[in-house]
Regions:
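Acidic, PIN/NYN-like endoribonuclease modules and their adjacent C-terminal/linker elements
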Residues: 1-5, 101, 105-130
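Short, well-structured N-terminal submotif of metal-dependent ribonuclease cores
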Residues: 1-39, 48-64
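Alpha-helix capping/helix-boundary segments
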Residues: 12-13, 43, 75, 99-100, ...
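A general structural signal for well-ordered alpha-helical segments in protein cores
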Residues: 24, 44, 56-59, 76-79, ...
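Acidic catalytic patch
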Residues: 45, 67-88
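Donor nucleotide-sugar recognition loop
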Residues: 90-93
């Protein structure tokens, strides 16, 4: 059974912010379809670390309107197991992506991302397709 809640990766927010035509972005389309979405504390960090002071309000307002899922003990255990598996297969992905994937897996949520090349290496992760 597919979850109605979708977890959004950093790439979804960056794409929305960079594009002039907001309607062409997945974030806009999901909101327009009234899809429920969340994100992770890792994604929030990645977005906010690159934001200017002028952009901070926009991002804080947006993140305040959705559930931000934390990286906790359970997600740490999941991330460690995935890391070991990917390392043994010589298919390591970036640590932030690994942490984001572990949180989505923990909460049994599909992950919406524009970075499928990295995330598809994590077999346990369900990727969202529109």
């Amino acid at each position: 059974m597919e979850s109605r809640l979708i977890c959004l990766d950093t790439s979804i927010f960056v794409d929305y912010f960079r594009k002039k035509n907001k309607e062409s972005t997945l974030l806009f389309q999901l909101a327009d379809q009234r899809k429920a979405f969340s994100t992770t504390s890792i994604t929030k960090f990645e977005v906010l670390r690159g934001a200017t002071n002028a952009q901070q309000f926009f991002w804080e307002t947006l993140f305040g309107r959705m559930e931000v899922l934390p990286f906790d003990d359970e997600s740490a255990n999941i991330a460690a197991a995935i890391f070991q598996k990917l390392k043994s297969q010589n298919k390591l992905i970036g640590i932030p992506d690994l942490l984001i994937a572990s949180i989505a897996i923990q909460h049994k949520l599909p992950l919406a991302t524009l970075n499928t090349r990295e995330f598809q290496k994590v077999n346990e992760l369900q990727l969202y397709s529109n």
